[in-house]
């Protein structure tokens, strides 16, 4: 029934008109869904990628540093290059947890204008220790953006911490809730910061169709969240199935995917592909990801096909 409602909205959309340049009604629905206090504000972006670029543009003075951890979301490094910022990546520990001493030392030495921390982290899927995150936010001289793209699969958020840390902003996207094609993300934070960032936001960056469809979907947020809850249950099942395969080491995940390490990852990836299953080969993306592959949780049928194909591929490579 949601598909029918969306089709009806699209059919009646005034696409001959410019979109609302500051869609307050959409912001209000988002504010209600995330229970954001009135003294904080929201900035909308054409996906979180646009917001990452906007933040970099706002802080990209000469020799300004953008700092993040590695491995993490590749867009942080890419946007630093696009905007002329110096990128500094601090490696995570071998178990993908934060290396707090190394991060604090990098902050002290580099004095970053902008920091990104993915929570849960992409591609490892784990939630960093909240107390360690707080120490890093307090030590940072510039803006710290907590990227909560996978919040709906984790349930843990830094939104309540914004008032405690004046340099903290929280970013989310609706892509992981089945709205990737709409390209809609948002940044939450103090009105002071967002008021300045709004000056750099391009007008009409959220299309007429995106505004209409997003509002309709967010009015049915309970349906979307129930889908996320199902993915969380399926994630447990897939993790347990992976644990049971000799030679496969899955990593605990709070996202909608699972990272796992397996010998001959390249051959396993090809074996899966030959069996009609396409996942992400991260084995050459970063030294810490050696022999790592990442699978997104799908439908129960897709998950079963993946597990069976993986079992066959592992047996073939032994």
Which residues fall in each region the model found?
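PLP-dependent aminotransferase-like
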Residues: 16, 58-117
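Short beta->alpha connector loops at strand-helix junctions that form conserved
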Residues: 70, 89-94, 148, 172, ...
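Conserved PLP-binding catalytic core of the aspartate aminotransferase-like
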Residues: 231-232, 236, 242-275
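Active-site phosphate-binding strand-loop segment of PLP-dependent enzymes
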Residues: 94-148, 152
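N-terminal small-domain helix-loop-helix segment of the aminotransferase-like
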Residues: 1-49, 54
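PLP-dependent aminotransferase class I/II
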Residues: 167-244, 249-250
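PLP-dependent enzyme catalytic core of the Aspartate aminotransferase-like
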Residues: 274-275, 284-318
């Amino acid at each position: 029934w949601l598909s029918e409602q969306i089709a009806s909205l699209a059919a009646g959309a005034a696409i001959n008109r410019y979109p609302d340049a500051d869609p307050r009604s959409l912001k209000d629905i988002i504010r209600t869904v995330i229970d954001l206090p009135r003294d904080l504000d929201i900035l909308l972006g054409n996906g979180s990628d646009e917001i990452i670029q906007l933040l970099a543009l706002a802080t990209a003075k000469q020799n300004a540093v953008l700092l993040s951890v590695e491995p993490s979301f590749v867009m942080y490094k890419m946007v630093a290059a696009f905007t002329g910022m110096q990128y500094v990546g601090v490696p995570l520990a071998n178990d993908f947890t934060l290396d707090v001493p190394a991060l604090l030392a990098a902050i002290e030495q580099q004095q970053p204008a902008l920091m990104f921390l993915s929570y849960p982290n992409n591609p490892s899927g784990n939630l960093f220790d909240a107390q360690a995150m707080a120490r890093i936010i307090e030590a940072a001289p510039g803006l710290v953006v907590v990227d909560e793209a996978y919040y709906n699969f984790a349930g843990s958020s830094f939104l309540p911490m914004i008032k405690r840390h004046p340099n903290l902003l929280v970013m989310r996207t609706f892509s992981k809730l089945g709205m990737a094609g709409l390209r809609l993300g948002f940044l939450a934070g103090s009105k002071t910061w967002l008021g300045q960032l709004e000056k750099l936001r391009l007008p009409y960056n959220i299309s007429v169709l995106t505004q209409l469809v997003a509002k309709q979907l967010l009015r049915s947020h309970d349906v979307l969240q129930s889908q996320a809850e199902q993915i969380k249950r399926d994630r447990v099942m897939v993790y347990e199935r992976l644990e049971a395969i000799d030679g496969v080491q899955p990593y605990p995940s709070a996202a909608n995917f699972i990272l796992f390490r397996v010998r001959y990852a390249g051959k396993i990836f090809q074996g899966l592909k030959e069996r009609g299953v396409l996942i992400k080969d991260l084995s050459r993306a970063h030294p810490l990801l050696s022999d790592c592959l990442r699978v997104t949780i799908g439908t129960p049928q897709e998950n079963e096909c993946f597990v069976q194909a993986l079992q066959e591929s592992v047996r073939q490579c032994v």
